[in-house]
Amino acid sequence: MNNQAYGVTPPISVANSTPKENELNDSLIKELKSRGSFESETATKKRVEVLNILQSMTEEFVYKVSIKKNISEGMARDVGGKIFTFGSYRLGVYGPGSDIDTLVVVPKHVSRNDFFEVFYELLKGRSELEEIAPVPDAFVPIIKIEFAGISIDLIFARLDIPRVPRDLTLDDKNLLKNIDEKDLRALNGTRVTDEILQLVPKPTVFKHALRCIKMWAQQRAVYGNIFGFPGGVAWAMLVARICQLYPNAVSAVIVEKFFHIYSQWAWPQPVLLKQIEDGPLQVRVWNPRLYALDRQHRMPVITPAYPSMCATHNITSSTQKVILSEFQRGIELMNDINVGKKSWSDLLERHDFFFRYKFYLCIVAATRSTYAEHLKYSGMVESKLRLLVQKLELVEGIELAHPYVKSFENGYYCDNAEEAHEIMNLYGTSKGDDRVKGVLHAENNDNNKENVENKVELHMTKLFIGLKLDLSKEGEKKLDIQYPCAEFFNICKGWQDFDSEKHFIQIKNVKLYDLSDDVYVDGETRPIKIAKRKRAVSKNEGKKKPKSVGTVSAA
């Protein structure tokens, strides 16, 4: 029995698992395996081999830069350089096809420019490299690579120390001194994941429970920080807290308690894995007593590593309602699973987002240019979607503005600008599906320049918000969302690289029965509108609820 104290409060129960709970746990692991949650031993060994190569390359990178900066041969060999992992790989919850979040840590004489020049060239010289995409201007500068069949996100941090030996750990807060904000953000990922693993009583129990909750959150479409839902680190911390409260429980019990505890949680009381610490930096630490912005956080989940921050600051009124509703569904299903009425597969059933609402807003970001340029623009629009959600929540008549957590992309080569505009105007609807039949797909071009000469290249990304309306007020006819849409357009057009000749943004209202086919997956039958019989119009017709959201202007 594990009697060590974990967390900011005593445990709720230190009871060991019962035979029935162990049986339930076995069936959970079996379900996760059947859904491909675990990677093969061979694939995992390959990851380790690739990380060993990257470690050697990091040392070679630091050596080359050191020599270039007139450091002696002996010292250049000794200054080191080390890689750290973070995210799902470090937490031990990765699956087939998962990427590896990797941090390259270097001594003080190696710069970020060196990373994007010298290390970049070293990577390009490797036969294992399949793809490489440097993004030096990102919030956390990154080099994305496909290396020996594995996707890897490489970020960089320079420490204010002369050597980075292989046995260096990042738990000493003093290592954060005299570094810039980008370095601090880069180091934070590894420091947070390392602390989470140190703060759970039984790491294996935590990992299996997290695999389940992560899969549940993805299946139920409540996973994604950028869209106003918890991201991977936040879900990990939420699971870790339950592990602290039930230190001797098996993973199946952790999952059950997860839903019960968080559906009754006194939000906005924060979820903490340890007391918030002070440190040596003049940086802001999460503190709702001091900062008004921190008081606005609806479901705060606080990172354990200094400087502590809220990992769920993007949650809105609507996304909180959606999350709490999913917690309640989880409770009901766990009750049935416990008595054998339901199975784990019912808990992990796919969401019904594209069946749930009568009205949807389809936000279209379009670029008449290359796919690479479109990715930058559409990424910016995605990052701003939650701001539109927040503005819609203030509109009278909107009870819920529910963002979907994935985008859909398509590219076409159009005959002319008029055809491109027509396709754009219908994109996201069933009519749009019909319109593009026979139009050359940009992704299927195979770089055949003869096929696309004099064509207009068009790339589009669509995002969806489901609207739950309450138009019960007497005489309420229309929902006016012109103002929040206009504000959103202005935000997008305020992007520093916005070009009105190339970049376009639209918001259109689409009814359930008019959604495009690609939002449904194999096995789902899209809703079909049943034609109603015509009837006589009564004199009270004007008092009934409206049948549409009204027209939304496009920009």
UniProtKB/Swiss-Prot annotation:
Q: What is the cofactor note?
A: Binds 2 magnesium ions. Also active with manganese.
Record's GO cellular component, any one?
cytosol
Q: Where does Mg(2+) 1 bind?
A: 99, 101
Q: Which cofactor does it need?
A: Mg(2+); Mn(2+)
Matching InterPro entries, A to Z? NT_sf, NuclTrfase_I-like_C, PolA_pol_cen_dom, PolA_pol_NTPase, PolA_pol_RNA-bd_dom, PolyA_polymerase
Annotated GO biological processes are:
co-transcriptional mRNA 3'-end processing, cleavage and polyadenylation pathway; nuclear mRNA surveillance of meiosis-specific transcripts; single-species biofilm formation on inanimate substrate
* Marked site positions, Interaction with RNA: 139, 144, 313-314, 386, 391, 487
Region annotated Disordered, chain positions: 1-20, 532-555
Q: Name one GO molecular function term.
A: metal ion binding
The record's section on SUPFAM superfamilies has: Nucleotidyltransferase (SSF81301), PAP/Archaeal CCA-adding enzyme, C-terminal domain (SSF55003), PAP/OAS1 substrate-binding domain (SSF81631)
Task: Report residues binding ATP.
Answer: 86-88, 99-101, 153, 214, 223, 232-233
Give the subcellular location: Nucleus
**Keywords on record:** ATP-binding, Magnesium, Manganese, Metal-binding, mRNA processing, Nucleotide-binding, Nucleus, RNA-binding, Transferase
Which residues are Mg(2+) 2-binding?
Answer: 99, 101, 153
Reaction equations catalysed: RNA(n) + ATP = RNA(n)-3'-adenine ribonucleotide + diphosphate
Q: Does the keyword Nucleus apply?
A: yes
Question: Recorded E.C. number(s)?
Answer: 2.7.7.19
Q: What else is known?
A: The C.albicans mating-type-like (MTL) locus contains, in addition to the genes for the regulatory proteins (MTLA1, MTLA2, MTLALPHA1 and MTLALPHA2), a and alpha idiomorphs of a phosphatidylinositol kinase (PIKA and PIKALPHA), a poly(A) polymerase (PAPA and PAPALPHA) and an oxysterol binding protein-like protein (OBPA and OBPALPHA).
Q: What does the similarity note say?
A: Belongs to the poly(A) polymerase family.
As for what it does, the entry says:
Polymerase that creates the 3'-poly(A) tail of mRNA's. May acquire specificity through interaction with a cleavage and polyadenylation factor.
User: What name does this protein carry?
Assistant: Poly(A) polymerase PAPa
